[in-house]
A protein has these predicted regions:
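Short low-complexity, flexible loop/linker segments enriched in glycine and/or proline
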Residues: 93-95, 118, 176, 297-301, ...
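Ser/Thr/Gly-rich flexible loops in soluble cytosolic domains mediating phosphotransfer, phosphorylation
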Residues: 156-158, 366-371
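Small-residue (G/A/S/T)-rich helix-start motifs and N-terminal tracts that mark the onset
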Residues: 1-82, 196-363, 370-387, 392-520
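Nucleotide and nucleotide-moiety/phosphate-recognizing core
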Residues: 36-130, 136-163, 354-361, 379, ...
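Residues immediately flanking
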Residues: 165, 189-191, 260, 366, ...
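Short beta->alpha connector loops
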Residues: 84-85, 107-109, 167-169, 192-193, ...
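Internal gly/pro-rich beta-alpha loop/helix module
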Residues: 122-123, 128-225
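Short strand->helix junction
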Residues: 85, 130-135, 170, 176, ...
Length: 520
């Protein structure tokens, strides 16, 4: 599903008009979609009290249409005008005809009536400002937003729903005005706006739903929009096919180079995730002191012990051992739990930056990234297609910037550096991003604090490597892997909550997550 900027959304609406869809039809469809979402949230409209905060433009007109439908379905709907509407408002009279009560700031300068309405209603729809507003909030709009946020902290907290965008949220960047309230749900119209999937915007948007408004589906696909939200349908379409006459060689061989004396678990998690994602064979190359522990836990994995230094990290001489067998593997995963030292840096430099089999794919994570960042112009020496999976701190180290700089504009940061390095970048975090060198960025729909624990990144890396071993391209494997990882995390959260879940819980859920995704 395409994710759009304001200009791109305007372009799609104009293209829809050229294809015979009127702006009025788009507006009617938008209002109906929001009304249906509100009815679903309320468990039915009849007898429910709904307050629609109406602004001066098209967003407000959509809100009036929503109020009309809710009133038609039996709700007690009130349209509260935060700003003056046009004198000849084509959406006002039909709303009144269907029983919508209309009041507003001009009759309620102290906002006392607004406070009473919010105190009695079951649901509030924010239809004040849409994609056309980027100035700081002021005047009555700011005052109303402040009252809305204050209502959240009272004993009576109605459901807060935003129509397309919460008022005060920048649709392109996700920046928010200090007066922007936090919604329970945002119904994005047509396509989700980029700012709803960035932070702090996503936190203010609440749960995100996307409603079609009648824009012909082919228009977005034919456009040059290069930002996509990963969907289950997209993931299902790209999952590896497993023919009935398959054997273990059919599904590829992953080599996991990982672990150290202090981080045995990272090696285990990455290798086991590759196995559970469906790689035909997985080999773990780890320090000799890690080998007996890992071998006891990973009975389905082939083991390749490597020489180690006095601290239990892989010795630089281990690169010769690994390089001598590289032609046996389809994917090389390197970095998880390796630790950082001059020796591990030398090991990785000799392993990754020398001549390697041309068809070998690579995934580099965690300590592999930190070691890589110490090698001058490492990206010019990498061979073969590569996926990097940094969290924001690792991304800052790789780019020579800071974590706040990376987080301030995650999409452009991932896209820019993916192009510069000519690698696929998986920038982890809430709404993980997958950026490909050609400029396409995919966004994960998942935000799960339960995944903020040690080892979950190692699992993600193993999933991506396992999918690449089965023949998926780096960008597609990263997109599918991020979605599978997120969906497995949701399954864990549903079962035990988001406190106390561990990375191993994700691995247990991988086979059934993939099974469920394959079901139409």
């Amino acid at each position: 599903m395409k994710v759009v900027t304001v200009d791109q959304m305007v372009g799609l609406e104009q293209a829809a008009v050229r294809h015979g869809v009127s702006l009025d039809t788009l507006m009617e469809n938008a209002g109906l979609a929001v009304a249906e979402a509100a009815r679903n949230e309320l468990g039915g409209a009849a007898g429910k009290r709904v307050l629609v905060l109406v602004g001066p433009g098209n967003n407000g007109a959509d809100g009036l249409v929503a109020a009309r439908h809710l009133s038609r379905w039996g709700a007690n709907a009130t349209a509260y005008l935060v700003s003056n509407r046009p004198n000849s408002d084509p959406k006002m009279e039909p709303a009144v005809d269907y029983g919508v009560t209309v009041t507003g700031v001009d009759r309620d300068p102290e906002l006392a009536a607004l406070d009473q309405l919010m105190g009695r209603c079951h649901l509030v729809i924010d239809a004040i400002l849409g994609t056309g507003k980027s100035r700081p909030l002021s005047g009555p709009v700011k005052a109303v937003m402040s009252r809305l946020e204050a209502c959240r902290h009272t004993n009576h907290h109605p459901i807060f729903m935003a129509l397309d965008l919460p008022t005060g949220l920048n649709p392109d960047t996700g920046e928010v005005d200090p007066a922007c309230p936090k919604m329970d749900i945002t119904v994005a119209l047509g396509y989700p706006k980029a700012g709803l999937l960035g932070f702090p915007g996503a936190e203010h948007a609440g749960r995100l739903e996307v409603a079609g408004i009648g824009i012909p589906s082919g228009l977005a696909e034919e456009s040059e929009i290069n930002l996509d939200l990963i969907t289950p349908e997209w993931t299902r379409e790209h999952l590896p096919v497993r023919p009935p006459n398959s054997h273990k060689g059919t599904f590829g061989h992953t080599l996991v180079v990982a672990g150290s004396r202090n981080y045995v678990g990272a090696a285990y998690l990455a290798a086991q995730a590759s196995v559970r994602t469906g790689a035909g064979l997985t080999t773990l190359a780890s320090p000799s002191s890690v080998y007996p522990i890992a071998a006891g836990k990973l009975t389905e994995v082939i083991h390749l012990p490597l020489p180690e230094d006095n601290e239990g990290r892989i010795h630089p001489e281990g690169s010769q051992v690994v390089r001598s067998v590289l032609d046996r593997y389809d994917v090389l995963l390197a970095g998880c739990g390796m630790g950082w030292s001059q020796g591990t840096k030398e090991f990785l430099e000799k392993l990754l930056l020398g001549e390697i089999p041309h068809e070998l794919l690579m995934v580099i994570d965690a300590d592999g990234l930190d070691n890589l960042s110490q090698i001058r112009e490492w990206w010019r020496r990498l061979g073969g297609p590569v996926v990097l999976t940094p969290h924001p701190g690792e991304m800052a180290t790789l780019t020579g910037t800071s974590t706040p700089e990376v987080q301030r504009d995650r999409i452009n940061s991932a896209r820019q550096w993916s192009r510069h390095w000519n690698v696929t970048v998986v920038l982890k975090g809430a709404h993980t991003l997958i950026a490909e060198p050609a400029g396409l960025v995919r966004i994960s729909p998942f935000v799960n604090p339960g995944l903020a624990s040690g080892g979950t990144g190692d699992v993600l890396t193993g999933i991506i490597a396992g999918l690449m071993a089965q023949g998926l391209s780096p960008g597609v494997a990263a997109g599918c892997g991020v979605y599978i990882h997120g969906q497995a995390g949701e399954a864990v959260r549903m079962r035990i909550g988001d406190t106390g879940s561990i990375a191993s819980d994700l691995i247990e859920r991988l086979p059934e997550t993939i099974r469920d995704l394959k079901r139409p």
